[in-house]
């Protein structure tokens, strides 16, 4: 009988993720994220620990009445050095796509990586969520979080509902094999999924969160879905080359990527619609990565470089498993 090594490794990784999520959601598994440091200015004080406890019973943890000043949906957009695209995004969303939305029913925040390190899309989305959890600690679990790209939006209103319910992830735009582009998820479900991996290179974070959502039993609904090539979704051209980390591919294929709870020493301050993220530590050191340029015209599939699964990596670049 022939066996596929790739299939065996994939099944093993899925089982590891399943066990990890099970253990992390046990009664006493979570440690408080006591390194989350919101900053209003350069001398900001440390706030109390940010709890990472995930409610097991959704109805019991959802407030019956939500104040009028709490939005029903929050857009989180990973961001750095895209000022013109940001202006166009806000103009089009407010004047066209969301023009009929009641005032105060939604908020848009740009999770701004405010440092010189490689851009970490997963961490920006994770920290954007954590910042909103801090802002709405009693109600974040029932808010619909919409993860969106700054260079992408519907051409007209009423194409996308930007709403979902508990247990359902609404994927509106992207590819079927990953939760990228535009999707909506309830705060409690995002927290249960453990969020995105904090990869330092392009790609794969969307693959991981799709796997995590499925592992905990969430349904991915694509009944209102637009493929990446659909011209009804406006998407700015941003070149063909992407910076990838060879280490990310190895972690995705052979190990367990880090997650929402791996982020430490987070420092941020909010200015208008910016969440300015000045520092964070994750499960892997960006200075210990090996980066390369990838031309997306050659496809989106990232392969494990030959010999990389046998390399010796610095201990602080590997996420320490909890099982």
Annotate each predicted stretch with a short phrase.
Residues 2-12, 20, 207-323:
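C-terminal catalytic/acceptor-binding lobe
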Residues 18, 25-30, 34, 40-45, ...:
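Asparagine/serine/threonine-enriched low-complexity, disordered tracts
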Residues 72-74, 208:
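Cell-envelope/extracellular polymer assembly enzymes that use nucleotide-activated donors
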Residues 74-82:
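A conserved hydrophobic helix/loop-capping motif in glycosyltransferases and polysaccharide synthases
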Residues 76, 107-114, 144-151:
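Extended hydrophobic secondary-structure segments that form protein cores and membrane-embedded regions
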Residues 82-97:
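Short, well-formed alpha-helical segments that are part of the catalytic scaffolds
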Residues 103-141:
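Active-site-proximal specificity loops/subdomain of glycosyltransferases
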Residues 120-122, 144-148, 152-248, 252-253:
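Conserved catalytic core of nucleotide-sugar-dependent glycosyltransferases
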């Amino acid at each position: 009988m022939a066996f596929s090594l790739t299939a065996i490794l994939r099944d093993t990784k899925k089982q590891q993720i399943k066990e990890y999520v099970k253990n992390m959601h046990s009664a006493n598994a979570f440690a408080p994220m006591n390194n989350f440091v919101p900053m209003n200015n350069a001398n900001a004080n440390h706030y109390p620990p940010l709890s990472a406890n995930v409610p097991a019973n959704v109805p019991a943890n959802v407030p019956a009445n939500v104040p009028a000043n709490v939005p029903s949906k929050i857009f989180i957009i990973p961001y750095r050095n895209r000022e013109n695209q940001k202006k166009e995004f806000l103009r089009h969303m407010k004047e066209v796509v969301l023009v009929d939305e009641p005032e105060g029913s939604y908020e848009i925040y740009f999770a701004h990586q405010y440092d010189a390190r490689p851009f970490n899309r997963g961490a920006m989305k994770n920290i954007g969520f954590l910042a909103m959890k801090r802002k709405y600690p009693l109600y974040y679990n029932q808010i619909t979080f919409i993860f969106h790209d700054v260079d992408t939006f519907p051409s007209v209103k009423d194409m996308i509902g930007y709403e979902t319910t508990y247990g359902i992830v609404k994927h509106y735009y992207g590819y079927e094999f990953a939760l990228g582009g535009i999707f909506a998820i309830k705060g409690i479900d995002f927290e249960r999924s453990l969020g995105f991996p904090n990869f330092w290179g392009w790609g794969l974070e969307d693959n991981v969160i799709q796997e995590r959502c499925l592992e905990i039993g969430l349904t991915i609904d694509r009944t209102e879905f637009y493929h990446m090539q659909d011209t009804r979704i406006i998407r700015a051209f941003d070149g063909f080359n992407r910076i990838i980390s060879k280490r990310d591919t190895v972690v995705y294929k052979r190990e367990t990527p880090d997650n929402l709870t791996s982020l430490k020493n987070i420092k941020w301050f909010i200015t208008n619609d910016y969440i300015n993220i000045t520092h964070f530590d994750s499960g892997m050191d960006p200075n210990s990565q090996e980066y390369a340029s990838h031309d997306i015209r050659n496809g989106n599939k990232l392969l494990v470089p030959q010999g990389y699964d046998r390399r010796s990596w610095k201990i602080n670049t590997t996420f320490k498993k909890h099982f």
